[in-house]
Structure formats: structure tokens, C-alpha cells
Amino acid sequence: MSTQFVFANYAFYRKVSNTCKFYRVSIDEKKMSLIKNKDGSYNFSIEMESLRNNFEMVMLVGFISVGQAMSHQESFAKKKPGYSAIIPGDTEVTVTVPVSRQNTIITAKATADQIRQLSDGKVDTAAFMRLIKDSIQTL
């Protein structure tokens, strides 16, 4: 594992965590995973918990925080020669919703382009949810 990947991994996690805290969504960095695939691409997954009625907001904050981390990586790559930004091609957000005795688990996936559209303000949150609606699953 290269030192650049380790640093980028830490920076990515910190940016995601700080953005979630900004939106008052608690997050555990141990429930984040940034994986480098054999082809050199990256996948990111995050597990979050919501209250009964706000799982959509928590899910959106997860995707927004990944978008902020991607922007941070890109701006850092412009400043530092030889540094390549860590941009996950696919991101999966899993939200645990406490409903009755058993929790409901809702997952959704989005591509880097979809997340970038959301974080850049090109689509609003409702349009973003329509973009990813086919990937949303209840487990």
C-alpha cells in the first residue's frame, strides 16, 4: 500500500466525517471503507444510522459528504504535483433505521458523476434521489 493511498484514505475519511458532523449526523469512521480495485478504480461505502423518520436526510448527507471529499481530493491534487486524487467510481450508503424491534436497512448506490452533480448543485436533492432510485434497496 503506497503512502499516498494511506494519506488520501485518511484525508477522505476526515472530510466525510467533518461534513457529516456539520450536518449534525453522527458517524463512526470505522464504518467507512475505501477500497482500491485491481483496475485502479476505487469504491467507497459508509454505514450510517438515522432516527425513525429522517433516513432520506441521513442518506443524502452521506452522499453530499462523499462529494465534498471528492472535491477536496481534486483541489489537493491541483496544488501538489504528482498527487492523484482518490475519486471513488461507486459509492454505497447504508442507513440503519430503527423501526419496531428489528431495524430496517436501506442501501443506495451512486456513481461519481451523480455525486458530483449533487455536490456542485447541478441537481437538487429530489432530482438526485430520482437519479439513484433504481439502486435503492430495503434489506
Where are these regions (language model features)?
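Boundary at the C-terminal end of the N-terminal hydrophobic targeting segment
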Residues: 2-11
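Polar/charged, Gly/Pro-rich intrinsically disordered segments
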Residues: 11-50, 77-139
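Short, non-transmembrane amphipathic alpha-helical segments
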Residues: 56-78
